[in-house]
């Protein structure tokens, strides 16, 4: 991947592995109290997870599925419960450790955890790839390249999310450009579907959009 991709990936790793680990762990713990704003994000992510999983068969027995950017492992658990052999990948070692600790004992034989880049060819072939909010910080050309490369190793579909190009999210993006802070989250980049299609092709389609308070995300599907 080009240097822009690597630079953003390293920034994402630094943020989630050093600055935001505890906050992310709380956000992804259902009975943990969070602020009203973060509660809307939690609810939005729960809804989006259900949308994404609806694109995969209920029975994934015999399927090899990558949870790309698995975080604390919520999607990983659901995929394993459907019978998939899950490759759970995240750039953050600390989040991987949390995901390992939270994995139910009866599912441990169904999941292998990996710290690193979801685009690493060494991860092998997959039937499906799920990438929830893992590509939201990257530019359209980089997303196109990731999809193209992953598509060569994916038999059925890549289901992923982006930040849609809305007035609300564009305002946040401009604020992030104007007032950068070294200790804050990397700035997500809103995308229009037609621009992404110019880099990934017409096999990229929109599935659904979830908007819940401060969480706004769009589910897309790429079929190689």
UniProtKB/Swiss-Prot annotation:
What Enzyme Commission number(s) does the record list for this chain? 2.1.1.11
Supply the InterPro entries for this chain: Mg_prot_MeTrfase, Mg_prot_MeTrfase_C, SAM-dependent_MTases_sf, Small_mtfrase_dom
What are the UniProt keywords, alphabetically?
Bacteriochlorophyll biosynthesis, Chlorophyll biosynthesis, Methyltransferase, Photosynthesis, S-adenosyl-L-methionine, Transferase
State which gene encodes it. bchM
**Listed name of the protein:** Magnesium-protoporphyrin O-methyltransferase
The family database entries (Gene3D superfamilies) matched by this protein are listed as: Vaccinia Virus protein VP39 (3.40.50.150)
Q: Does the record carry Transferase as a key word? A: yes
Instruction: Write out the transmembrane intervals.
Output: none
Q: Which GO terms describe its molecular function?
A: magnesium protoporphyrin IX methyltransferase activity
Swiss-Prot/TrEMBL GO biological process terms: bacteriochlorophyll biosynthetic process; light-independent bacteriochlorophyll biosynthetic process; methylation; photosynthesis
Entry's family note? Belongs to the class I-like SAM-binding methyltransferase superfamily. Magnesium protoporphyrin O-methyltransferase family.
Q: Which CDD domains match?
A: AdoMet_MTases
Q: What does this protein do?
A: Converts Mg-protoporphyrin IX to Mg-protoporphyrin IX methylester using S-adenosyl-L-methionine as a cofactor.
Q: Which organism is it from?
A: Rhodobacter capsulatus (Rhodopseudomonas capsulata)
Q: Hey, which pathway is this one from? A: Porphyrin-containing compound metabolism; bacteriochlorophyll biosynthesis (light-independent)
UniProt superkingdom: Bacteria
Organism ancestry: Bacteria, Pseudomonadati, Pseudomonadota, Alphaproteobacteria, Rhodobacterales
Reaction catalysis annotation: Mg-protoporphyrin IX + S-adenosyl-L-methionine = Mg-protoporphyrin IX 13-monomethyl ester + S-adenosyl-L-homocysteine
């Amino acid at each position: 991947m080009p240097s822009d991709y690597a630079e953003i990936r390293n920034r994402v790793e630094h943020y989630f592995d050093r600055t935001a680990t505890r906050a992310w762990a709380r956000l992804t713990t259902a009975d943990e109290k969070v602020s009203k704003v973060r509660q809307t994000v939690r609810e939005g992510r729960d809804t989006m997870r259900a949308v994404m999983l609806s694109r995969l068969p209920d029975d994934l027995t015999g399927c090899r599925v990558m949870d790309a950017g698995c975080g604390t492992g919520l999607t990983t658990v659901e995929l394993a419960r459907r019978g998939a052999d899950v490759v759970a990948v995240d750039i953050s070692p600390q989040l991987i450790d949390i995901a390992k600790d939270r994995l139910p004992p009866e599912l441990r034989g169904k999941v292998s955890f990996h710290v690193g880049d979801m685009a690493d060819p060494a991860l092998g072939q997959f039937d499906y790839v799920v990438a929830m909010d893992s590509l939201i910080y990257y530019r359209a050309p980089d997303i196109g390249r990731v999809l193209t490369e992953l598509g060569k190793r994916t038999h059925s579909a890549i289901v992923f999310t982006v930040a849609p190009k809305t007035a609300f999210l564009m305002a946040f993006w401009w604020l992030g450009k104007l007032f950068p802070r070294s200790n804050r989250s990397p700035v997500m980049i809103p995308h229009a579907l037609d621009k992404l299609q110019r880099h990934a092709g017409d096999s990229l389609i929109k599935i659904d959009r979830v908007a819940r308070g401060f969480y706004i995300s769009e589910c897309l599907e790429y079929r190689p």
